[in-house]
Amino acid sequence: MRKLLGITALTLCTTSAFATDKNVVFSCTSTEGKPLTVKRVGNDYEYSYDKTIFKNPIKKAVTNDGSIIARGSGFTTYALELKNDGLKYVVGFVQPNGNSKEFIEPGATISRDNDQPSIGSVDCDPYKKIYYKFDVHLMNTL
């Protein structure tokens, strides 16, 4: 009986923890041990990493050139481009088709808004949980 109560309590805690994540679009733990998160906040996406926190309107973000879900031969690219203070933050990864547990280069690439080469990145730790739930019905799909 105690085991059943313990399992039930654990299930309720786990369920409520996942329920609070319903607005998360992408999250991971960086190789530096810090959380990288993009979540829905009202009509905006909110990017959060370390001390950098900003919002973009969802309707604008999903139409940015770098926001795309592209299915190719063997791989699918998931990317969401957000902008802040003249910088572009492209959050996403590449995934082999048919293997939802493998992530290639997950994280965020940061570049100047004028399409110059990247000036930095946030790399997700591939050994920690990576969560994604991109708005596939809103984003550019190829």
Regions found by a protein language model. Give the residues of each.
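Sec-dependent N-terminal signal peptides
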Residues: 4-13
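Cysteine-centric segments in proteins
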Residues: 20-142
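Sec/Tat signal peptide C-region and signal peptidase I cleavage site
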Residues: 15-19
